[in-house]
Amino acid sequence: MSIIILATISTTQENK
């Protein structure tokens, strides 16, 4: 569960 959230925020930060 936490891993998914962490991956999501990671992708968002990299996209920006």
Curated annotation (Swiss-Prot):
This is Protein YtgA. Induction: Expressed equally in exponential and stationary phase in rich medium (at protein level). The gene is ytgA.
